[in-house]
Amino acid sequence: MLKRTLLCLVALVALLASTPSYGRKTTVLVSFDGFRWDYPSYYDTPFLDRMASHGVEGSLIPSFPSKTFPNHYTLATGLRPEHHGIIANSFLDRATGAKFSLGNPKTKSDPSFYHGEPLWLTAQRQGLRTAVFYWPGSDVAISGKRPDVWHDYGEKPHMTFAQRADSIVAYLGKKAAPDLIMAYFEEPDASGHSFGPQAKETRRAVEAVDSLLASLWARIERAGMGGKVNLVVVSDHGMTWFTPSRKIKPSDYLRKEWYDALEGNLPCNVYAPERWQQDSIVKALAGVPHLRAWRKADIPRYLHYQADANIGDVLVLPDEGYLFCDGDTYDGGVHGYDPYCGDMQAVFRAWGPDLRQGVSLGKMSNTAVYPLVCHLLGIKPAANDGEEAFEEIKGKALVK
């Protein structure tokens, strides 16, 4: 009898392990690039407002620097840039001399730059299915693997926003639906850069993605899947106004023999390996209004920007609304500043069967998103920097 019982248990375990995940709740994580936390206060966003009143809302404090690639990879891994390796949109690899750049397909797709474990790999490692649309880093073979469904951002034309939404609905309707769907949308960042955060074009972009999201959710509900989907909406950073009169030129203050390379203008990583070079730079910039400069060892701890070897020997950080560059500039929107500047903070909304209703979380670190999504998926997170931040919101945000 005991032997028969044990055989039945073994068979049951095998059956459960091979059973498709049809009926399991799916988490859909959507990112709207450059969606400032307070855009819903200025523009007409009825769906995000509905999510706020019937779900969980808050604002995300980005990780430093408040740039697209570093923060999307933070959202995906729960690690700050100093720990996950993507320390800026462009930087130097000290070991090889190679320059990582979003415009360089060779380095952008080099997995050696990407540390930590992104959500799609954490989910796959624990037996879940994943589909990812253009999320930064998802087209890179990190640890030799990519999501089950992925799209190469370098291949043009990209899927339109409507096509991405159509695909999400289609995948949710499959019997073997993905357990995790992640989708990246370039707006309102593109409009914010071109026209500024208060421009009518940016307003239209904000309202358009809200309408897109409303349509997506309506289709999910019409298909009878509303009770099976947890929807989480995030952004990587906010946006503030810049005008060329606020440009600070490095050439006005720095001699070329003081550094090997300047990477970025907001912030600027200065590669100056000799101590005398570093001291010369910091001294020359000490009295310049509207910027701060530190040797790497002196970067303020709250920025969490010291651990990675590829961080510059000197960091130059302009005040909000200023740039440190010699190149051409134009009126428009910018980001990359201290993450505690209000205009840099980003939108957060979440609702679904596993999330509470009518909850305001206030400001929260964006490192909490990774462990939050892992919890919604019922999987164990990899090592990350967001556990403490997640514990602060867990009881408020989650049903269980």
State the predicted function of each range:
Residues 40-84:
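Short, structured active-site-proximal loop/turn typified by the sulfatase FGly-forming signature C/S-X-P-X-R
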Residues 79-196, 325:
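His/Asp/Glu-rich, glycine-adjacent segments
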Residues 228-229, 235-273:
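Acidic/histidine-rich catalytic neighborhood
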Residues 1-9:
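Bacterial N-terminal signal peptides that target proteins for export
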Residues 158-173, 188-229, 373:
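A long, amphipathic alpha-helix that forms part
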Residues 262-372:
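Active-site neighborhoods of enzymes that stabilize oxyanions during catalysis
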